[in-house]
Amino acid sequence: MQLPISQYNELLQKKLEKLTALLHPFNAPDIQVFDSPTSHYRMRAEFRIWHEQDDFYHIMFDQATLQRYRVDEFPIASMLINRMMQTLLPLLKQQEVLHKKLFQIDYLSTLSNKIIVSLLYHKTLTEEWESAAKNLKDLLEKQDFDVQIIGRASKQKICFEQDYVDEVLPVNGRNYVYRQVENSFTQPNATVNCKMLEWAIDCTQNSEGDLLELYCGNGNFSIALAQNFRKVLATEIAKPSVAAAQFNIAENKVDNLQIIRMSAEEFTQAMNGVRAFNRLKGIDLKSYECNTIFVDPPRAGLDPDTVKLVQNYDRILYISCNPHTLCDNLVELSKTHRIEKAALFDQFPYTDHMESGLWLIRK
């Protein structure tokens, strides 16, 4: 697989032109552009495994033709993932219990040089598999991999030490530690993620009052932004993400950030006094003066009720993975807020995907 590296700048310029045109009706200022490394930028990858007689290998599917193709190296993924791909398969081939009915391998790597390898099977994992997988882990560690091996099958998950890795992200000269849990969302392009955090910190400099973040994941943004606010309140519904966020808060010595496990809808009910929640015992919502809100919605954008909720705040930091639904939301948001800053983050080079950020201020 070869990347069109020589065309990178031209492709990024086309994205900028598209985003500029989409934001033009909303009087957006000039868009800041944050580029990506041109190869080995993706920190996670998933591959199906294709078995052919006595051989097997990584495959992917062409999105246009749906035809499978063999993948022996993957320049999109981190150098660590590529090294693991080439080391792992020969070791798996030595043990039938490790490769029989293996149908997928997921890799999650970090800038801190740690990696999780998840092996997915169409069979029950036995003690024989466990013994072989432990031996596999030992062999990889002897080749200088800091690796966690996880086995997955129907209603089964086996891990030997832990199901997470601790990433270290350099942001504005400071290292932030982020626990990343296997099979949970993490930002795929670590270098661009660092640039997103630096941009968000820059936008919110000299902020007054408190910050609310909806669906904070492992605390990626709220931990870095806490330095700019008196207090930060963040919501998240996934238990593993909440646990990782709590670890990250402690590890980064952030003392003004509170995570609560509830949906945006539940939080709105609690904030408006519509109903009480046991999960909020010991948390005085009235003590928060949140006049800034951070949202990073899925591709569908914000639903109409959340748009109304967001409009109650003086300042909105909006990270979008879909500029079209962002513009749908801006039809309403632009009635109450103006765009102060706009950014394009090239999370996914060589694709049409555009990650963008807006800093909106009440008119």
Swiss-Prot record:
GO cellular component, one term: cytosol
Class of this enzyme: transferase
Originating organism: Haemophilus influenzae (strain ATCC 51907 / DSM 11121 / KW20 / Rd)
Keyword annotations of the record: Methyltransferase, S-adenosyl-L-methionine, Transferase, tRNA processing
Xref: Pfam families: tRNA_U5-meth_tr (PF05958)
Function noted in UniProt: Dual-specificity methyltransferase that catalyzes the formation of 5-methyluridine at position 54 (m5U54) in all tRNAs, and that of position 341 (m5U341) in tmRNA (transfer-mRNA).
SUPFAM superfamilies from the UniProt entry: S-adenosyl-L-methionine-dependent methyltransferases
UniProt-listed CDD domains: AdoMet_MTases
Family annotation (HAMAP family): RNA_methyltr_TrmA (MF_01011)
Primary gene name: trmA
InterPro entries reported for this sequence: MeTrfase_TrmA_AS (IPR030390), MeTrfase_TrmA_CS (IPR030391), SAM-dependent_MTases_sf (IPR029063), TrmA_MeTrfase (IPR011869), U5_MeTrfase_fam (IPR010280)
Protein name, per record: tRNA/tmRNA (uracil-C(5))-methyltransferase
Active site: 321 (nucleophile), 355 (proton acceptor)
Record flagged with keyword Ribonucleoprotein: no
EC number(s) given by UniProt: 2.1.1.-, 2.1.1.35
Chemical reaction(s) catalysed: uridine(54) in tRNA + S-adenosyl-L-methionine = 5-methyluridine(54) in tRNA + S-adenosyl-L-homocysteine + H(+); uridine(341) in tmRNA + S-adenosyl-L-methionine = 5-methyluridine(341) in tmRNA + S-adenosyl-L-homocysteine + H(+)
GO-annotated molecular function: rRNA binding; tRNA (uracil(54)-C5)-methyltransferase activity, S-adenosyl methionine-dependent; tRNA binding
Family: Belongs to the class I-like SAM-binding methyltransferase superfamily. RNA M5U methyltransferase family. TrmA subfamily.
